[in-house]
Amino acid sequence: MLGHALAILRPVVMETGNALLADQLQSIQQNYRYLVDYFLSGTNDPRRSELIDAMIHDTYELVDEVYLAHRLQNNTDYEFREMLRPDNCVIPTYPDPESVDNADPTFRTMWLSKPDDDHLLLFRKLIADPAMEIEAYLAISGLTLSLLRSFSEKGFLALIEAAEEHYLIPIRERAWVSVLLLLLVYDDRLRFFPDIVAAVQDLLDSDDQRVFATTAMVCIVRTLGVDWANKAFYSLQKSMTPLINKLMPKTMESEKISQDELDDFSAHLDKDFQEILEENRQEMIRLTEEHLDTHFAMFKDMYSSSFFSEPFRWWLPYDPDYLPEEARKQIPIFRILHMNDLCDSDRFAFLSTLSRIGFINGQSVSELMEQAGNEAEDSEAETGSRILCNDYVRQAYRFFRLNPWKIQNPFDALFQLPDSTVFRLLYTSAADKRIIASCLMHCRAYEMAAKIYAQIADTLQSAEVYGHYGLCLQKIGEYEKALEAYKKMQQLGSSEWLYRQMEYCYFAIGDYDDALQMCELLLQIKPDSQAYLYEKANVLIKLELFAEALAILYKLDFLRPNNVTITHEILWCAFVCDDFEAAIRYFKRLEETNTTNAIDWINMGHIHFIQDKRMDAYQSYKRAMMQMADLKKFLAAFRPDRPLLVEKGIRLDEVYLMEDQLISSWSEK
């Protein structure tokens, strides 16, 4: 899969005209080639798994850089380039893409490494060095992501030190944003780390630091939305009331801000945020329509919001889906969409976070939220959340339906909604789950759909639901479970479709008697159906009722005289039924149309062998070997017929002798 991905990526990289990206791709391809060569040579490399993970990481990093290069290359109106400038970013970000490229190893080191003493020493040196301004930005971002993946008290304290000591205000604000987000994420475990709580409280004793912390809160509010921030910080206040009391009330008092002024300020922020959101959305739609978005087309609406756009991707700089399951759960977007931890299980908070999508079916999300708020208090979250999540799933899986070859891509891990806490929280009614399951099924996400149908099938007691549930199980090879669902559907009413699916499942598990019964029921509905007649003939062959199968096949041959598949079946059944004349006649028909296969030649060899025409049998068997071009395949087809040949009057020692001659002739080639 990695080699295929690199081959697909190569022309996209060449389009950028960026020599650095081309060199990175060539390096990854060479390393992959060396790895494959060592593997094929039989060399046992204990670090093979680690090397593969590293190459996957480098590939995703390269994809993200190519994506950014395409956007920069094709935005001639300067809008996107201006958006990347730090003074246009709500959350302070790095100065420019070129500088980040030069300092990227620093970011990678801090992000992908566990915060141990050596890396924290490097972090402190970067923070303390005035010449390392860009590296300090990236080190804070990288350490934040590392802490989201793997909690470390020492790493947390190092971020607090950066928020306290750095002489540059933007870097201090960046550190404060990281500290506050980590406080929110790890709210439930802070009571076990009193040193962290004490350090933050001591830091907030300073008026200057409270101003920085308040600025960081504003950054988070502008990025995630007023409603989300209010809910999240209220949740944090439950366990850290002294800290929050130091932060907001004292800041408001020192700045002499009234509650009305604060409300006006929040409304102003929200208005600005919606404008930014709409601008980003239109830009992404334009890029997608011009086929310039090579990587994130499936997130056309969600990824266009400022929550996901370039200035705010400092915590998600690369597509993180290659990370292990536990690591993904620590990244904020995954926590929001999958774990819901940041929202403290508050549904309306999750709805507010999803509001960053922008517009759904032409209606702004803010209108949907207002509409949801007009409902009863207990249902306001569920109404809007269902609308948003249903559309999110439909858009995501519409991409897979239009690009089915990407269903094996690691991106599909993003859509494991049936296993997520969010899914269980939002879709409390069976009717809602039925909508999502139907969407997943029609997008060929059968395993996910089956998980949802399993939750609701017995509750709804619907023939349609049981049918869809059985079909999903059938598609993933769970035939016994599919039959259980179909039998429950049969209790509510029978149909031709149901019999057809049950016959398929019975045949797949080798229950040919029941499969034959289903064929009889199907033929009662459509007696002249050639498809059902052919299915019955196949079942009869499996039951070794060759004479009955041959009668049906002759009928089908009359109806469809030029059907090669039916001719092959007649040849075999006629041979087993000792009707050698008919078998030879149908073989000649195949030979005249040049449609014989290796099995046909084996069958003719059997006929000649039984008729004591050993040389003709030998030549027929050799023709079969030539067509198969593989002795093992030939023997795998020939040897199961030994009992049949003995039953037809050939001694077993003669069968072995013929087999030895064939093997010898193959060895002499």
Region annotations inferred by a language model:
Residues 457-458, 487-491, 520-524, 554-558, ...:
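Conserved structural position within tetratricopeptide repeats
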